[in-house]
């Protein structure tokens, strides 16, 4: 089901946290409202959540108001930050202006000078006067008019238009326009007096510039503060705009001088903050470098470095967040003890016991806790519980192999595709043996693992998976252990559902696909159509510009098989498949298939993935352990050891493992037994709790009997993979009225225990490629039990479907059989009204159900009380004849009414 189709569910504790109320209050309300919940970690649906929000509406309103206030506060803070940022940018612009023109920016006079004419000083005193950083002169004549220059230097009223323009750039508030001709002088530009006189060298200039930096920064900071305050006052007063100053106005000049001097006096009264000279120089250098690098390769490199730095910081933050989240997650099995849970959380067991006591549960240090209790305890101590299987919890840790220890290994290739598309026939030709002859119905029903040697000492391990839809789990397991998938599609058929499923399994496991279009020797073969359908399924072959290799083959004639093998080996070389071939490392593998042999015991097919598996190695696999008694290849020949990518049959298991379990060699029998026992204890606890719940559920079903019918089944098969495929296929067959209930499933022959269980639970026994022993057969005949034997899996599914359809209530259909018209009404004493009718169509029977229609409206529905022709009682009347009848319990009949006869027909339902 898609996520859109699922109904949203909410945890009670999360709802309580959202409303900021006690979870117990919410739990109490849900129980009163009729909700079936056990604890505060239980889930409720959307309607119940809406009911909770309505009940706690006052609390929700308070929470919403608090959230709104918090958001408004955050908005105000963000606005203040934005305002501070803009203020900082203005300061930076002022500093940039200074760094670009330090001597012009220093042209503002610092003292108020009277407007009277001042006598010019001698020329020899000029260096001392001009040495101040505020002085910039304006001259229009050569050096002999130095007196006039000195006069203009001391008079701020007679500043030139260029000097005023510089001041406008700095202040950004008032635009000044000063007459160009003052005192009879013509202004052409500004001139640095010291440079014009040729006094002082480059070293003196640098020293003077450094001395002036601090004073300039102080002045600019004071002026900026004054301007900002004045601008704020003006905005408060109504934001009146300043009028431009007219040319030639003496009042304007006086006002300008007075306002400038007043601002400077006001600025002097305020204590200047001390600014570090190194900070100023650093800011100026960074600003200048930024202005210089606004374009070109340097700017792009700088941006790239900055982006890389931001990305690294972001990656570090994400990694830290992931580590923090992982630290707060504990991986625990479902029925862990209080002591084990305390060890995982790093606390004392007594703290868990105390917390359970406050919850109303009395536990001991070795008592096993259920899932809900573990979640609540972990949440209380700030952890999130992630439940894992008992195998994952006791997983054996291994040291990772070094790169120099790895060697090239043969690829593991899985052949996938739809039923009867030629997967096993392809493997037949490669192995030069007839595998199909050994399979019932000509279809593969096990995962077969085979090793094939090609030219040049090259080897490939093949896994042949079933193509029938019941073997979805098998195909998924095959995709997990494989390196390359050969997708077989018949050229005379099309891309079928199992073909698409195989593609999805391969893509989900990240396994490359090599397409083999089979049966090209047939006359109706159409490989191009197959390629088109594959492209629609997301597999675009290389011939069409895609990335998937494709080869047209004929598995019967051998056409294109060698080219297909070359493409598989090429794909393997690209992937650089490696494994550790050292004999010192403990071996590891995957159990592909497991079965119970009458003479050998438990036999499992293991695909070795690391190291060499030898006879005598102790191992653990899933819930069982053992010691390797014998190793055999796929042809039954005994071998001494098996290396990576080699399939091998292993004897020596104490119990039957499950397909897909991890096979790990242990240092000793004792360690292997300890791990297996831990897993068995957890599994037994899980099965015990589950069986208890099943019994309670069955009691509830007995109370509601009649709502659901069940077909109880006991499954016995030859291999674990077949059991899983059968169980998956049968559990899919159900509807709202009937379903299959698997009482027991196992590998091996049918025993007396199975027969007794079937007799007690009224179940049928299904044997898939297994037979009962003598005692079980005799007992089954005595108990008159239904025992069925099959060798093809879809025959089992078809028979179970038919059995379930027989348990369904039939559909009832109404079938019209005839209609009569009332043409006369007779009143008969002690009987009532009798209708004289004419049979319009069909037939009417004495026991027929009838309805009375008047003007097309039904006014009676019942049965006939009598049916006569003339004075004789009859069983039926055909069309075209007249008859008399009266209705049982009804006498209000009139001329012109229609009597319609019908019967109820039962129709068999389908699943």
UniProtKB/Swiss-Prot annotation:
Compositional bias of kind Basic and acidic residues: 80-94, 101-113, 214-256, 273-284
Region (Disordered) residue ranges read 80-142, 153-172, 195-309
Residues that, per the record, bind GTP: 417-424, 464-468, 518-521
Q: Please provide the record's keywords in A-Z order.
A: Cytoplasm, GTP-binding, Initiation factor, Nucleotide-binding, Protein biosynthesis
The record's section on InterPro entries has:
EF-G-like_DII, EFTu-like_2, IF2_II, IF2_N, P-loop_NTPase, Small_GTP-bd, T_Tr_GTP-bd_dom, TF_IF2_bacterial-like
Q: Which residues form a coiled coil?
A: none
Where do the segments described as G4 lie? 518-521
The annotated regions of Low complexity compositional bias extend over 286-300
| Annotated ranges, domain tr-type G | 408-578
Location in or out of the cell: Cytoplasm
CDD domains for the chain: IF2_eIF5B (cd01887), IF2_mtIF2_II (cd03702), mtIF2_IVc (cd03692)
Segments of skewed composition (Basic residues): 262-272
The segments labelled G1 in the record are 417-424
Q: Which GO terms describe its molecular function?
A: GTP binding; GTPase activity; translation initiation factor activity
Task: Give the residue ranges for region: G2.
Answer: 442-446
Q: Specify where the region named G3 lies, as residue ranges.
A: 464-467
Name a single GO cellular component: cytoplasm
What are the boundaries of the region G5? 554-556
Concerning PANTHER family, the annotation shows: TR-TYPE G DOMAIN-CONTAINING PROTEIN, TRANSLATION INITIATION FACTOR IF-2-RELATED
* Family, as annotated: Belongs to the TRAFAC class translation factor GTPase superfamily. Classic translation factor GTPase family. IF-2 subfamily.
Functional note: One of the essential components for the initiation of protein synthesis. Protects formylmethionyl-tRNA from spontaneous hydrolysis and promotes its binding to the 30S ribosomal subunits. Also involved in the hydrolysis of GTP during the formation of the 70S ribosomal complex.
Q: Which NCBIfam families does the record match to this protein? A: IF-2, small_GTP
Q: What is this protein called?
A: Translation initiation factor IF-2
Lineage from the top down? Bacteria, Pseudomonadati, Chlorobiota, Chlorobiia, Chlorobiales
Q: Which gene encodes it?
A: infB
